[in-house]
């Protein structure tokens, strides 16, 4: 192609280079100023911000709950300390009772010593009596000797008279001594009687006071035991609630840790993707650099073509001038020839001149020919063989590169879609986990409220007098499933891009969550029923042996009805629950006052087991039991084992109580036998025996379970009160009359001078060998001695009976002390268990705090990672901005080149001919095609920039659908004009990245592409451009994918 019409291009190109350099410097200074002015912020999405705020609020709530648990633990410790102080007070009271018992034993020992002294005195008196009898015998022998030897001597008679007088004197003295001894004995007897009366009164008062104190102590012990049992039950319920909350928290922590591990894995994948993106960005940068180099080479080729065209034009002008000169000379020669013919010499000279001119022109042609051959515009088509081959190879390479880049861009778009879907799933899972946490907290609050209501109902029931009787100690142990399948909501990262499948999965996950929540609520209601059944039963288990009391039946019916109402409110949808409800209603309708509660409880257990089996069969695919959840079930199995151990303990206690009751019954039967064997005139034995027989009937009823221990104790108290009123005493196997002696008997003992004597006693006295020579005095002496011995024996027997009574009382007190010690041991064991539970709660709270700290540290690490990723993204954005700036500079240079070309066109229109006008039109077409290709290159580069931008985090707010549609319509309109109007070349604004829409909503072109560079072009030039480039307005979107290949394939035409 001939380029002779551009002789002025060289100076204009020099000027354009200077203008481009100045514009580039100005643009760099403006960009640096804008970069200095614009603050750099870290972009965080709204969902991430809300997620971080939610985590902070959860941590604060967990801190508040931990503080509440600390306060509860402190209250438990204070209660334990108060219990220990009460136990110490009980031990001090027991020590005081032991001291009193020791005092009573000392008093008994003193009384025994007094009895021994009296026995010694009686033994001395007996010895004196024996000596006196020996003397009487000797005197009788002497009298016989005197009667036999009366005839021997009168002197002996006088001597005997003297001896008789001395004997009478000794008798008088002995009688005086006996009188003195009788007075002393009377005084001793009076003192003994007074002591007996005082001791009897004191013992009676002491026994009454002790019985009253013991009754008070027993009542206080029972009340305190009931209070302690209630407090222990409350503490057990609180510990169960705490253990459940801790288990739920541990499950939540495990889930959070799993989610964090998954998030870490996702972050690692994102990091790897970012690294890949960085590599791709580097490769794209390299490709852009290569393209820029090629553009520079093409620009240099353009300049060379322009220079060659200018030189060709100059040579052409010179040739024209020479031709003109030759024509002038030819005309001159013709005129000379016409005037006159030249001679031979003139012809030879003309030949030489013509040959010289031909040589000069041939040399000039030979000089011009290599330039024309080397130029790409020599042939009429405008292409040379080497240039065409080079352009085709480059076009094929660029097409392949474009296809590879498009494939990579599509892969990157798919990966970003996958990541967005995964992030959306994560957000939904986090929302679901938060909802589950809220539901669990609400359930815990409702459980606490229900426990408080149950405690208030229990206190109100205990106030009622009809409900003070015993209840059966039955405990319903229901194995809770505990399968909190909130973790099943979290699916795998592999997602389907279609939205319908995603919606279906979300609906299935919601259905699973609802089903699992209903199942968990059902199990919680069962546990509440178990608690309600255990609380009143355990509070009254110490006062009952078997489980067939009427009031116990009423209480159990009330508890089961409350549980039934709770179950009716818990779940109303599943068929298993409806079946369970019908079965439970049948069982409750079949309950009667005479029914066995243990049987009812067994039926309820069977129903619960069937319901658990049905729930497991109905949802085998939805409820997945993981090993971690199985390990979470272990505390509930321990609770069941503890319930079984408690039942065994209660059974052993019931057996011990049965043995004690049978011993008491045997004692009362022995008392009845003694009363029947030794009935006295002062006792109405028949009524007392009938009372004992009624007591034995109640004993049989208690053993059979028809009556409770309260009736047994009341009947036993009636028997003892009757025995105390009738003054019945138990002395082993022999009854005494010490306490029922009449005043006549006391007078008989007190007055030995009375002459009313029974025949049996007189015969016993005469059997001792008394001779009735002088019947008056010896008979009276024997009678007095018999009465004294009988009275002493009776006193000894009375003292022995009193001693035995004291021993029995002491044994009873010892038994009571043993019972109190057993109660104290039980209380201590209960305190130890409470302390252990408190220690477990402390350890669990410490574990919770440590886990919270680890979570905080992990959250800090994640924040650090996020900040690092944000920094990387900012770096990538800065690099993209630099590339945009470079692109804008290239666009400005292209605009300047176009302006120069337009100027050359305007100047060349005046001087060119028709052929040159055709050439110019061709050149203008080629330039317009180049401009179109440049626009397509700009579009592809801008699309690449957008795709690089999409690797940044999502914006905080999405644009509304109206704005999206408007932007999309504007982009379509602008897309039709970018190929024709050079002012539509994209100048990307950094402010557009804030309100960026997702890639799947973007159009191939951005509204920011409509920004123009009107500062460098005038309206007339724009109009001329629009008029000339009207043929290119019908560009299709396929040019965006094949723009680079067309541009580089058409460059060879220059």
From Swiss-Prot:
Biased composition (Low complexity): 371-380, 450-461, 470-494, 1007-1032
PANTHER family: FILAMENT-LIKE PLANT PROTEIN 4 (PTHR31580), FILAMENT-LIKE PLANT PROTEIN 6 (PTHR31580:SF4)
Coiled-coil intervals, chain numbering: 64-139, 174-200, 250-341, 389-463, 637-666, 788-944
Source taxon at top rank: Eukaryota
Keyword Coiled coil: yes
Signal sequence annotation: none
Subunit note: Interacts with WPP/MAF proteins.
Pfam families, alphabetized: FPP
Encoding gene per record: FPP6
Species this protein is from: Arabidopsis thaliana (Mouse-ear cress)
Xref: InterPro entries: FPP_plant
Family that this chain belongs to: Belongs to the FPP family.
Keywords: Coiled coil
SUPFAM superfamilies: Tropomyosin (SSF57997)
Region (Disordered): 359-390, 448-506, 951-1054
Protein name stated in the entry: Filament-like plant protein 6
